[in-house]
C-alpha cells in the first residue's frame, strides 16, 4: 500500500507542490571581479519576480595619521562607556560635510572685489555730515545754534553787529497777486520773525552770541571760556572739532547772558593774539 502511495504518475504536475515557495537566492562571482546576485520575490499580483543585480566592489585606501587611527580604536569611557559603537545623538554633533570647489578664476574675482571695495571707499571718503549753520560735523537739526544764527551764506539773514536788516521787498502779509499761504516768519520780506516762547530771555541770548574765527587747532573750549568770562557771564561755548583727528576746525561760538558783555568782549578780543594766531571776533548773524 505504501509503495502505491509513493509512486507518482508521470502526468502529475511536480510544480504544484512548490507553487508557494520562492527559489533560493544565488550569488555568482564573475571573472572581472564582480558578483551577480539573483533574488526572487512576489509582486502585488502574487506573481514571482526575479531580480538580478551586478555588484562591483572597490577598495579605497586612505592614509591617515597613526595617532588618529589609534584614537579611533579607543573604547568609550566615562558616562558613555555603555553606549553603543558610533556617535550618539545626545553627546555628539556631526557637522555638515562641506565640499570645497576651487575656482580657476579666483585671482580675478579677488581683484574685482578689492577694486569695488576701494572705489566705494574713495567715493565715501569725503562724505561727511556738515551743519549748514555752523559747519560743524553734526546734523543741522542738532546744531546748538540753530535758533541763534542763520545758515552761512543764506540771503535775508540779519546782521546783528551792524544793527540793521535788509529792506523788505514786499508789503508783507499774504503774497501779492497770489492766493498761496505765506508762513508768518516769511511775511514782511522775511525780516519779521515770529514770537519766541519765553520772551526776552531767548531774545537776549540770540543777540549775545559771538562768532570767533581763526582759532588755533590746539584750542580747547575751557580755554575760550576762561578768556571770554572776563567780560561777563558766558552761557554757552561751542568749538567745532574734526571728528577723526579731534582738533579744532578754526571757529567757535561764544554766547553771553547780556548783550553789553558780548559787545565789550567783541571790542576787546577782536585782533587778540591766541596761540600764535590773531582772533577774529564778530557778532553771529541772527536767524531770520
Swiss-Prot record:
Region (Disordered): 1-35
Compositionally skewed regions (Polar residues) per UniProt: 21-35
CDD domains for this protein: eIF3G, RRM_eIF3G_like
Subcellular location: Cytoplasm
Domain RRM: 208-286
Any one Gene Ontology BP term: formation of cytoplasmic translation initiation complex
Gene Ontology cellular component terms for the protein in this record: eukaryotic 43S preinitiation complex; eukaryotic 48S preinitiation complex; eukaryotic translation initiation factor 3 complex, eIF3e; eukaryotic translation initiation factor 3 complex, eIF3m; multi-eIF complex
Pfam families membership: eIF3g (PF12353), RRM_1 (PF00076)
GO function term, MF aspect, one: RNA binding
Subunit field text: Component of the eukaryotic translation initiation factor 3 (eIF-3) complex.
Stated family: Belongs to the eIF-3 subunit G family.
Role played: RNA-binding component of the eukaryotic translation initiation factor 3 (eIF-3) complex, which is involved in protein synthesis of a specialized repertoire of mRNAs and, together with other initiation factors, stimulates binding of mRNA and methionyl-tRNAi to the 40S ribosome. The eIF-3 complex specifically targets and initiates translation of a subset of mRNAs involved in cell proliferation. This subunit can bind 18S rRNA.
HAMAP family named in the record: eIF3g
Official protein name in the record: Eukaryotic translation initiation factor 3 subunit G
Lineage: Eukaryota, Fungi, Dikarya, Ascomycota, Pezizomycotina
Amino acid at each position: 500500500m505504501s509503495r502505491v502511495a509513493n509512486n507518482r504518475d508521470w502526468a502529475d504536475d511536480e510544480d504544484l507542490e512548490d507553487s508557494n515557495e520562492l527559489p533560493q537566492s544565488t550569488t555568482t562571482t564573475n571573472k572581472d571581479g564582480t558578483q551577480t546576485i539573483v533574488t526572487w520575490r512576489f509582486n502585488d499580483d502574487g506573481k514571482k519576480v526575479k531580480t538580478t543585480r551586478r555588484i562591483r566592489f572597490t577598495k579605497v585606501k586612505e592614509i591617515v595619521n597613526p595617532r588618529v587611527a589609534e584614537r579611533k580604536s579607543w573604547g568609550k569611557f566615562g558616562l558613555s562607556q555603555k553606549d553603543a559603537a558610533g556617535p550618539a545623538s545626545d553627546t555628539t554633533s556631526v557637522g555638515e560635510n562641506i565640499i570645497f570647489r576651487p575656482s580657476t578664476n579666483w585671482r580675478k574675482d579677488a581683484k574685482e572685489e578689492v577694486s569695488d571695495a576701494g572705489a566705494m571707499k574713495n567715493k565715501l571718503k569725503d562724505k561727511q555730515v556738515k551743519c549748514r549753520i555752523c559747519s560743524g560735523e553734526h546734523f543741522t537739526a542738532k546744531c546748538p545754534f540753530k535758533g541763534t544764527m542763520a545758515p552761512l551764506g543764506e540771503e535775508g539773514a540779519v546782521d546783528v553787529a551792524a544793527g540793521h536788516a535788509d529792506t523788505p521787498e514786499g508789503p508783507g502779509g499774504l503774497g501779492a497777486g497770489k492766493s498761496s499761504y505765506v508762513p508768518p516768519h516769511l511775511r514782511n520780506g522775511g525780516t519779521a520773525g515770529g514770537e519766541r516762547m519765553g520772551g526776552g530771555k531767548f531774545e537776549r541770548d540770540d543777540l549775545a552770541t559771538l562768532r570767533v574765527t581763526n582759532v588755533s587747532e590746539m584750542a580747547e573750549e575751557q580755554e575760550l571760556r576762561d578768556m571770554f568770562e572776563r567780560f561777563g557771564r558766558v552761557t554757552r561755548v561751542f568749538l567745532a572739532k574734526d571728528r577723526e583727528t579731534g582738533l579744532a576746525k578754526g571757529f567757535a561760538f561764544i554766547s553771553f547772558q547780556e548783550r553789553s558783555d558780548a559787545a565789550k568782549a567783541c571790542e576787546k578780543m577782536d585782533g587778540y593774539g591766541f596761540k600764535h594766531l590773531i582772533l577774529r571776533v564778530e557778532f553771529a548773524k541772527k536767524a531770520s
